[in-house]
Amino acid sequence: MAKSIIFSEEARRALEHGMDILAEAVAVTLGPKGRNVVLEKKFGAPQIINDGVTIAKEIELEDHIENTGVSLIRQAASKTNDTAGDGTTTATVLAHAMVKEGLKNVAAGANPIALKRGIDKAVKFLVDKIAEHARPVEDSKAIAQVAAISAGNDEEVGRMIAEAMDKVGREGVISLEEGKSMTTELEVTEGMRFDKGYISPYFVTDTERMEAVLENPYILITDKKITLVQDLVPVLEQVARAGRPLLIIAEDIEKEALATLVVNKLRGVLSVVAVKAPGFGDRRKAMLEDIAILTGGEVISEERGLKLENARLDSFGTARRVTVTKDNTTIVAEGNEAAVKARCEQIRRQIEETDSTYDKEKLQERLAKLSGGVAVIKVGAATETEMKDRKLRLEDAINATKAAVEEGIVPGGGTTLAHLIPVVTEWAQANLSGDELVGANLVARALGAPLRRIAENAGQNGSIVLERVKDKPFNTGYDAQNDAFVDMFEAGIVDPAKVTRSALQNAASIAGMVLTTEAIVVDKPEPKTNTPASSGSGMSDYDY
């Protein structure tokens, strides 16, 4: 396909125009009085949302060159979302402001490479300053405040996430599910839960709730498929003599062996439940090992020289209680604290070493399950459209609270960045010169953009609000919800330091890339061909 090549000022202006469109669509959602954006969907109802990165992902322009600008600024939002899970709108607004300021300087003859160096140095200085001003999150009240702000000033959501974090601990997993009712509910699971249920409904002990509950059972853990009854008979005899229930976790159980278990269960010879092993491949082996450590048992595997027919009771795990439903198995074990602690430490090291986001997520899940912390928030809403919006807000709120726990909190509502304007300006004057100084100053001017936009979305004059905030102490900012200047920590208007830092770093990275762009190579649009059908052939005016 033929390519179109555009150079220098024309190239930068085309990128800028694409960025203007995306930044405006995203910026309208910023702050407590930000508006919503409606996204048309090819299938199903339109989506009404308030989430910067979701809006950014939807925007595709007809002009290929402008669309390149959209893709660049979208990266600032996406990368911030990946790193901190929130702050995507702030990152977009900051990147846009830096590009606008920078292009003026490039047009006036500044050296783009020196500008970028100045931007990078200023951002490094600002990141250190943000860390200096961050306060650690010490109680669930602070967690509730962060979550409420991130969920669009929804205090009920803030309280719920704080409660969930309180119960599952800071390493616990808080997951979201679509609820069946109008209200949003929190469900906390005690013990380790994995998403495999009983193989046969004949194992059920409570027919009303359709679940099997085993008190103080033995747990047989194996990574092989059980096909022969002969393999199981010695195991069943030992457990029957001990007079305790049995949970079997295996790759699969073939019909003949399964029938034997069901018959024993129905005759009352043995209380038994069989479930399939969770996960796949290497992850399955690791999860079975986790279950074995939690329950004080061994994984019976031929790789380790252990055979099922030779298995003895002392290689089985034990638990206080096991509950098995159609879809899930929950094991509540006690004791083995030292072994579990060592295993958790090992998983933590793996989390630090891995580069894959997916692997990190799965390892984090395993860590949470081992330390007994999984909370599920069931999102309720009147309509599907509202449900999707609430789910996105809750996702942001959960990510924001985790970020706050990691790096602490700073005054929210664009306040921190606004107060750092005079600080970075003074530092730049003392340490930089020439175009590097110009680069640092353009960062300083861009820092006021989020606060200015929050005020404008609340119907105020953004520049006046910004100047008034800059004259006040560091913790004082603008409360757009109540149109007042308040101590942001006391008012509970706080942002995670990690979110503010990530938004600034990613915005500066994209701005630096755009300013140092000298040429754009894009596909030439294909010429539109006129179809003969449309010219007087008696066809109707409608497109089909």
From Swiss-Prot:
Pfam families listed in its UniProt record: Cpn60_TCP1
EC number(s) recorded for this UniProt protein: 5.6.1.7
Matching SUPFAM superfamilies: GroEL apical domain-like (SSF52029), GroEL equatorial domain-like (SSF48592)
Disordered: annotated segments: 525-544
Regions of compositional bias (Polar residues) in chain numbering: 528-538
Keyword Calcium: no
Any one Gene Ontology cellular component term annotated for this protein: cytoplasm
One GO process term, biological-process aspect: protein refolding
Recorded GO MF terms: ATP binding; ATP-dependent protein folding chaperone; isomerase activity; unfolded protein binding
Subcellular location per the Swiss-Prot or TrEMBL entry: Cytoplasm
Family listed: Belongs to the chaperonin (HSP60) family.
Oligomeric form and interacting partners: Forms a cylinder of 14 subunits composed of two heptameric rings stacked back-to-back. Interacts with the co-chaperonin GroES.
NCBIfam families membership: GroEL, PRK00013.1, PRK12849.1, PRK12850.1, PRK12851.1
Known function: Together with its co-chaperonin GroES, plays an essential role in assisting protein folding. The GroEL-GroES system forms a nano-cage that allows encapsulation of the non-native substrate proteins and provides a physical environment optimized to promote and accelerate protein folding.
Protein name, UniProt field: Chaperonin GroEL 1
